[in-house]
């Protein structure tokens, strides 16, 4: 009887230790993990975040893995202890000649503990998960730049909706809406015949593009050139997303965050906006479509080019003064690579392949 009491106390202490260790580890979810190889391996391929939101998401991911490993090691240890402790050989060595090991079924305290403990661990996990998620999806910043993103099969269009005066060459707030193009889009929403709305969608046209944004400064991708979205560092930015056809997804891996890009986002009950507090690293970062959207989905890439606020002002100045110039000229004017360096365009021309195949066939016949 005394031995059973000791075993019961050990179980309780073990469970309490497990809960305490898990809580202690998870309590550090917002703290950056040590910068060493072990913690880098725990990122499981996640890149280092370049926004405060991404850094918190990355920290949470790593510490959850640490907690999972601690719990896993404890559970595997307990399992192997029981396996070897209650093997026939071990029991005979102890002088236990019973047919079966001592059974612990219907042990109410143990069953309650093993039911309560996982629930508590999940509660702790959610306690730290919710603030990180809220930070990533919050729309509480004061964005200095608003970027209008339009996805289409199979490329991207980027435009600047608003830019704060701090980043403008004339020190005045910039409203980038192309009024003429916007009016044409708004006029497209209704099909009228003899003064009646005859569109197939509650009177609206199937070619309704009134929900899209059209800007004076835009960059449009093509099969020859990857679209480059130029953004300032150390600046709050808002992204306003919409698709002109099917569902896409705007994903920059270093943001550790993606958001689906819907046609008619309001009607689809989709949040079309997200914000970042700042981008704290300059450089080139690849962006991708993360939603299967058709034949060339895998080639629907873009590049985010993060420059200093001063270079961003120079870039906007060049785009305003040379509205017909390609984006590559504006990039070259501020002294950076004019074309994408993180990804390449997918050439859809098959003529070269056909010619090569013909040569191979002719050679084989000879």
Predicted regions and their residues:
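Non-transmembrane, membrane-proximal soluble domains of secreted or membrane proteins
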Residues: 30-60, 83-366
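Central hydrophobic cores of alpha-helical transmembrane segments in multi-pass inner-membrane proteins
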Residues: 74-85
């Amino acid at each position: 009887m005394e031995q059973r009491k000791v075993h019961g106390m050990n179980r309780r202490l073990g469970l309490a230790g497990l809960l305490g260790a898990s809580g202690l580890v998870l309590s550090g979810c917002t703290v950056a993990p040590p910068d060493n190889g072990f913690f880098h391996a725990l990122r499981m391929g996640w890149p280092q975040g370049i926004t405060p939101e991404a850094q918190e998401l990355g920290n949470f991911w790593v510490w959850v893995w640490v907690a999972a490993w601690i719990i896993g090691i404890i559970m595997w240890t307990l399992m192997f202890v029981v396996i070897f402790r209650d093997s026939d050989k071990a029991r005979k060595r102890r002088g236990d000649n019973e047919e079966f090991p001592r059974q612990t079924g219907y042990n109410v305290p143990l069953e309650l503990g093993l039911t309560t403990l996982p629930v508590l661990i999940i509660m702790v996990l959610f306690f730290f998960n919710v603030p990180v998620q809220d930070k990533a999806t919050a729309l509480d910043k004061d964005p200095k730049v608003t970027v209008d993103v339009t996805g289409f099969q199979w490329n991207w269009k980027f435009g600047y909706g608003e830019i704060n005066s701090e980043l403008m060459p004339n020190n005045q707030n910039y409203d980038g809406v192309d009024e003429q193009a916007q009016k044409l889009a708004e006029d497209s929403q209704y099909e009228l015949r003899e003064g009646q709305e005859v569109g197939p969608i509650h009177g609206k046209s199937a070619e309704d593009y009134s929900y899209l944004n059209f800007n004076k400064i835009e960059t449009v991708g093509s099969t020859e050139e990857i679209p480059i979205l130029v953004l300032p560092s150390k600046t709050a930015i808002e992204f306003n997303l919409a698709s002109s056809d099917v569902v896409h997804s705007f994903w920059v891996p270093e943001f550790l965050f993606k958001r689906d890009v819907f046609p008619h986002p309001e009607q689809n009950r989709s949040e079309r906006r997200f914000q970042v507090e700042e981008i704290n690293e300059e450089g080139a970062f690849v962006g991708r479509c993360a939603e299967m959207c058709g034949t060339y989905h895998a080639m629907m890439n873009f590049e985010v080019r993060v420059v200093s606020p001063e270079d961003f002002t120079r870039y906007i100045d060049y785009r305003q003064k040379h509205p017909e110039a390609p984006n590559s000229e504006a990039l070259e004017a501020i002294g950076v690579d004019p074309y994408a360096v993180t990804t390449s365009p997918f050439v859809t021309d098959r003529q070269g392949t056909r010619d090569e195949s013909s040569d191979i066939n002719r050679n084989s016949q000879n």
